[in-house]
């Protein structure tokens, strides 16, 4: 590992540990900020130092009860600010596209550090604007759900679920969902079928525009795992550490889905395209291959939530169902039930942004936020409660991650309308160098020049 790799490893895994994450845990129940570690490099001191295990065990600064003694011991052993400063210096020396990416990563990590210090009472409150700008490159703004909501009402009416009845549009949505609910007892079989469907579509509409070297990379080597009593609705865990006899990666991942989740089949289709193929699993597998072939740097192997790269990846994943079908607009999808499912999923991600905006930007109470999400964004009662509560009021996720979905989705959709697939898809999958929601423009502008 070179010097920049050491700084990236210590900074990312230092922040991850400080917030209670464990990148080596195969389950989303233990992971948090760092999404992957598949380089075959030794883990850094930020992970292996004796004090780190206790911080992870107690949940770090995000734990129900903050173990200050454990955190202080860890911070005496690991100098996270020095790693971030070193990363900043390396970014300046490297320059170009990679240098800009590393500088953006450092800005996000610095903001996460400041949020941790805020919780510990060692720093000033971090402005909400700074948090959102760090992870998305933009200032916070409210969601605009009206057009999607109107289109849902139109499609539901055509399907026989009229919003004109006494229980209104919410009642129509709930009725539509009830008649299409996925039986969780059969989720593995259904998941395999839907994965195969989108993998075949991706072979037809994505693979031809990517470098031929990626054709041998499995896009969806994943196990679907129902999990009980999880705090999340679903968690994609990219592992990438299994090797074939010749030492090549197997590009393996798992997807844990909450066994209590109620989801319609069209929404499940969108979920699979988002989390698996051609969404997150495909993206991570391609980046692993690019790293193995020396096209991408070490930073591509330790991907990180609450960053501008994560915003781009969420945007890619939310557009994945369109990418798979080779279209740019929801109304071009072949089935109106599928269109409803996509619109409802995107409204849920608009609701994530709105929860963040109302909670941290306007200081609204949870009950008011939950009611707004249910009424204006058509989310289920369970989703409204989670997005306004556990997620929305989380000191890190609520301020840095919830705005990422909407921002990334709208930007990727715009880029796909503006540029031909032969240019934009290789760019957002990292084939011209690892990019984020801000630096992807530089790659595409260079192509236009």
Identify the residue ranges that each predicted region occupies.
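N-terminal maturation segment of proteins
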Residues: 1-449
């Amino acid at each position: 590992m070179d010097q920049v790799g050491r700084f990236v490893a210590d900074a990312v895994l230092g922040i991850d540990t400080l917030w209670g994450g464990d990148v080596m845990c195969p389950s989303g129940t233990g992971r948090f900020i760092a999404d992957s570690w598949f380089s075959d490099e030794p883990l850094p001191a930020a992970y292996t130092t004796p004090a780190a295990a206790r911080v992870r065990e107690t949940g770090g600064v995000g734990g129900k009860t903050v173990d200050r003694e454990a955190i202080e011991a860890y911070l005496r052993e690991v100098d996270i600010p020095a790693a971030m400063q070193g990363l900043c210096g390396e970014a300046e020396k490297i320059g170009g596209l990679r240098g800009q990416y590393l500088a953006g990563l450092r800005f996000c990590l610095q903001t996460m550090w400041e949020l941790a210090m805020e919780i510990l009472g060692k720093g000033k409150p971090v402005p909400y604007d700074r948090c959102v700008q760090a992870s998305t490159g933009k200032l916070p703004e409210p969601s605009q759900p009206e057009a999607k909501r109107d289109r849902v009402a139109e499609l539901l009416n055509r399907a026989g679920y009229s919003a004109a009845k006494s229980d209104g549009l919410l009642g129509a949505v709930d009725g539509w969902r009830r008649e299409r609910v996925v039986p969780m007892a059969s989720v593995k079989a259904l998941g395999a079928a839907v994965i195969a469907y989108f993998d075949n579509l991706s072979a037809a509409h994505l693979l031809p525009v990517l470098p031929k070297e990626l054709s041998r990379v499995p896009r969806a080597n994943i196990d679907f795992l129902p999990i009980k009593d999880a705090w999340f609705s679903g968690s994609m865990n990219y592992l990438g550490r299994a090797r074939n006899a010749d030492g090549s990666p197997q590009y393996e991942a798992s997807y844990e889905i909450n066994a209590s989740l109620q989801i319609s089949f069209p929404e499940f289709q969108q979920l699979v395209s988002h989390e698996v193929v051609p969404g997150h699993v495909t993206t991570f597998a391609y980046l692993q291959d690019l790293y193995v072939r020396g096209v991408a740097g070490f930073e591509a192997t330790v991907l990180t939530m609450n960053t501008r790269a994560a915003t781009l990846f969420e945007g890619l994943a939310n557009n994945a169902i369109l990418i798979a079908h080779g279209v740019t607009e929801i109304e071009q999808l072949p089935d109106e039930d599928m269109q409803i499912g996509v619109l409802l999923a995107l409204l849920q991600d608009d609701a994530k942004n709105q929860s963040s905006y109302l909670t941290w930007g306007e200081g609204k109470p949870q009950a008011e936020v939950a009611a707004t999400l249910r009424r204006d964004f058509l989310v289920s009662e369970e989703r409204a409660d989670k997005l306004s509560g556990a997620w929305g009021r989380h000191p890190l996720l609520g301020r840095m991650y919830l705005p990422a979905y909407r921002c990334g989705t709208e930007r990727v959709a715009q880029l796909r309308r503006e540029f031909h697939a032969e240019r934009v898809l290789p760019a957002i999958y990292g084939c011209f160098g690892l990019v984020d929601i801000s630096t992807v423009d530089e790659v595409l502008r260079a192509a236009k020049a």
